[in-house]
C-alpha cells in the first residue's frame, strides 16, 4: 500500500503541486489553464479514449460489476442534481453540472494511468468499460444542456450536433475498428500513443493552476457537497451495492471502487 502511494499517487500530487505553485508565482494564469484544458478535452482525451477502447477485452468484462457502478453513479448524479436545484436554488443547467461533477470520476486521467502500472488486464477492463459508459452518459447530459440553452432548436439538430463530440467519435471509431478487425498503421498507432500520453500530465498541471484560484463562499459550499458525494458517498454506496449482490468477488472490484472514489472528472470541469 505504501509503495502504491509513493510510486503511483505521489507523481500525480507532485504535478498538481507544480501547477499550483506556478500559478501562485504568476508564471501561469487561470486563462492559461483554460487553454491547456481545452487542448486536453479537444485533442488529447479523444486520442486517449480511442487508445483505451482499442485495448479492452469485451468478453472478459464483468457486466454485473459495471452495472452496479452505473446504478450507484446514477443515484449520486440525481441526488446531487436535486440538491443543487432545490437547496442551492441553482438553474437547471447549473444543477446538472453539479450532478455531473458529483458523479463523474476522473477515471480517464487519474485512475487509469495509476491502474495501468499496478494491476493486470482483468482489473483494467472494468475501468475501460466505465469510461465507455460515461462518454455516452456525457453526451446525454450535453443534449439536455443544449435543450435548456437552445429551446428553439429542434431535438434532431441537437442530436446531430453531438457527433461533433470528439470523445464520442473516438468511442464509435474504436468500437468500429474492433468489430471490423481493422489493423492500424504503425505510424498512426505511435502518433495516437504520443498524443494520448500528454493527456494526464497536462490535465493535472492545469488542475493545480485552478486549485490556486480563490473561491466565493457559495462556491466553497457547493464544492464541499461535490467532494462529499464524489469522494465519500459514492464509494460507500457502490460497496454496499456490491455487498448486497453477494455474487461479486471484492478482489475483482478493487479498481471499480477506485473509480468511485476518484476525484472529479475532467468533462464536468470543461463544461463548467
Language model features by range: what are they?
Residues 1-272:
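Alpha-helical transmembrane segments of multi-pass small-molecule/ion transporters
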Amino acid at each position: 500500500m505504501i509503495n502504491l502511494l509513493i510510486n503511483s499517487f505521489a507523481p500525480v500530487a507532485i504535478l498538481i503541486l507544480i501547477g499550483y505553485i506556478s500559478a501562485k508565482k504568476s508564471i501561469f494564469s487561470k486563462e492559461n489553464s483554460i487553454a491547456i484544458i481545452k487542448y486536453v478535452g479537444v485533442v488529447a482525451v479523444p486520442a486517449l479514449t480511442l487508445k483505451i477502447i482499442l485495448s479492452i477485452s469485451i468478453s472478459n468484462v464483468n457486466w454485473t460489476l459495471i452495472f452496479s457502478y452505473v446504478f450507484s453513479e446514477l443515484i449520486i448524479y440525481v441526488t446531487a442534481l436535486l440538491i443543487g436545484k432545490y437547496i442551492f436554488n441553482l438553474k437547471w443547467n447549473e444543477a446538472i453540472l453539479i450532478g455531473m461533477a458529483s458523479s463523474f470520476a476522473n477515471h480517464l486521467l487519474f485512475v487509469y494511468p495509476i491502474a495501468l502500472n499496478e494491476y493486470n488486464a482483468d482489473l483494467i477492463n472494468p475501468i475501460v468499460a466505465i469510461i465507455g459508459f460515461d462518454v455516452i452518459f456525457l453526451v446525454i447530459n450535453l443534449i439536455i444542456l443544449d435543450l435548456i440553452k437552445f429551446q428553439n432548436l429542434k431535438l434532431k439538430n441537437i442530436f446531430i450536433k453531438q457527433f461533433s463530440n470528439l470523445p464520442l467519435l473516438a468511442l464509435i471509431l474504436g468500437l468500429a475498428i474492433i468489430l471490423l478487425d481493422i489493423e492500424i498503421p504503425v505510424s498512426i498507432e505511435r502518433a495516437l500513443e504520443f498524443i494520448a500520453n500528454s493527456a494526464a500530465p497536462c490535465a493535472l498541471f492545469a488542475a493545480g493552476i485552478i486549485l490556486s484560484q480563490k473561491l466565493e463562499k457559495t462556491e466553497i459550499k457547493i464544492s464541499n457537497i461535490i467532494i462529499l458525494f464524489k469522494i465519500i458517498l459514492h464509494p460507500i454506496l457502490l460497496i454496499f451495492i456490491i455487498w448486497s449482490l453477494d455474487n461479486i468477488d471484492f478482489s475483482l472490484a478493487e479498481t471499480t471502487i477506485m473509480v468511485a472514489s476518484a476525484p472529479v472528472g475532467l468533462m464536468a470541469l470543461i463544461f463548467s
